[in-house]
Swiss-Prot record:
Keywords: Amino-acid biosynthesis, Aromatic amino acid biosynthesis, Cytoplasm, Transferase. It comes from Laribacter hongkongensis (strain HLHK9). The keyword Cell membrane does not apply. CDD domains: EPSP_synthase. Signal peptide: none annotated. This is 3-phosphoshikimate 1-carboxyvinyltransferase. Its main location: cytoplasm.
């Protein structure tokens, strides 16, 4: 197995330019493909997940061109009518491609087979499929019911229909439905139960609006796209830096003295994970923000405070808090993280196992993790990453106290291929 050994380094400082947001990149690419007109999307993330979306769009007949030596893509939209009506799409483990494309293909009509790697076939999609069937889509499971792979067939979608979706598994299901509603000639989605990860739904709605469609809403319980809604190109649009990726560097500043500044995202970000900075501040870190940057440094006391925090609003960035808890002065509890269990791996179980290797006392439940740090971290732990990019990036922070080995470090290619180079650039 390939591994990366990180030597201990107690002090980190510097500036990191963030790559584009994965969540924004894949949403913008899909909306540009569905719109009328040509769209220039600037700053698209270069990573496995966006590659899967770009490849799928090309297979579906979308004309796109990348500007030389840049991450700008010119996309000629299809006005909601996919040029290719039959395709076999491999989407890896990219949930931000698989879920939205499932909805956009099911409501537009055609014959499609969607599949991915083994882990993608373990990630639930049944709630989204049922909601799409409620709008008249015809979808069958090609393997285990409730999970990919999927076969999509031409359906009988009735404009203005109403469907329901559960809100407690993944907000990506609702986001996928919202982006696809204009393809159905408008309609309504009602949310059953408490919606998790609300900031990601807000992000989706903001981007939909940038492409000329306004979705009416009743809080987070009911969303309606009016009949006749059509996506229109905004001309040019820019992808923010990835706020989830910012969390590792901001934590590095809080744990390693700092200051560490990230650029590409700031106080006006449309991403919910920007609130990770608030969580660090609650732990005592010094936080400062500008329009296009955030900076973190260690508390004046030199050590973070333990916290109890509801992480519903920052599910991805909350993983970074779990590792930061190793450096806090007591027991930290992170709650409302049930969605961790259906991500790239069961992140609650994986996090508990790997924190334990570093000497932490860890307690877990269905939707929480509680971490009590040891007096001294165990040096030389070999951290398994479970083919999960965020596990690899989170546990690099342990090297602020002890030497650590990261197994399968290349898994960061899913969202941030250059992560370890960027992390190394902060070593004083």
């Amino acid at each position: 197995m390939e591994f990366l050994d990180l030597a201990p380094c107690a002090t980190l400082r510097g500036t990191v330019a963030l790559p584009g947001s994965k969540s924004i990149s894949n949403r913008m690419l899909l909306l540009a493909a569905l719109a009328t007109g040509k769209t220039q999307v600037h700053g698209v993330l270069e990573a496995d997940d966006t590659d899967r979306m770009l490849e799928a769009l090309q297979q579906l007949g979308i004309r796109l061109a990348q500007q030389a030596h840049s991450r700008t893509f010119c996309i000629e939209g299809c006005d909601g009518r996919w040029p290719v009506r039959q395709a076999d799409l491999f989407l890896g483990n990219a949930g931000t491609a698989f879920r939205p494309l499932t909805a956009a293909l099911a409501l537009a009509g055609g014959d499609y087979h969607l599949h991915g790697i083994a882990r993608m076939h373990e990630r639930p999609i049944g709630d989204l499929v049922e909601a799409l069937q409620g709008l008249g889509a015809v979808i069958e499971y090609a393997g285990t019911p409730g999970y990919p792979p999927l076969h999509i067939h031409p359906g009988h979608v009735t404009p203005g229909s109403t469907t329901r979706v559960k809100g407690n598994v993944s907000s990506q299901f609702l986001s996928a439905l919202l982006m696809a509603l204009p393809l159905a000639g408008g309609g309504t989605v009602e949310v059953e139960g408490e919606l998790i990860s609300k900031p990601y739904v807000d992000l989706t709605l903001r981007l939909i609006e940038r492409f000329g469609v306004t979705v009416g809403r009743d809080g987070y319980s009911r969303f309606t796209a009016e009949a006749g809604s059509h996506y229109r190109s905004p001309g040019a649009i820019h992808v923010e830096g990835d706020a989830s990726s910012a969390s590792y560097f901001l934590a590095a500043g809080a744990l390693g003295g700092g200051p560490v500044r990230v650029t590409g995202v700031g106080r006006n970000s449309i991403q919910g994970d920007i609130r990770f900075a608030d969580a660090l501040a609650a732990m005592g870190a010094g936080i400062d923000m500008g329009d296009d940057w955030i900076e973190a440094q260690a508390p004046a006391s030199g050590r973070l405070r333990a916290v109890t925090l509801d992480c519903n609003h920052i599910p991805d960035a909350a993983m970074t808090l779990a590792v930061a808890a190793l450096f806090a002065n007591g027991t930290t509890t992170l709650t409302n993280i049930a969605s961790w269990r259906v991500k790239e791996t069961d992140r609650i179980a994986a996090m508990a196992t790997e924190l334990g290797k570093l000497g932490a006392l860890v307690e877990t439940g269905h939707d929480f993790i509680r971490i009590t740090p040891p007096d001294q971290l165990t040096p030389g732990a070999a951290i398994d990453t479970y083919d999960d990019h965020r596990m690899a990036m989170c546990f690099s922070l342990a090297s602020l106290a002890v030497p650590v080995r990261i197994n399968d470090p290349r898994c960061v290619a899913k969202t941030f291929p250059g992560y370890f180079d960027a992390f190394a650039s902060l070593r004083a």
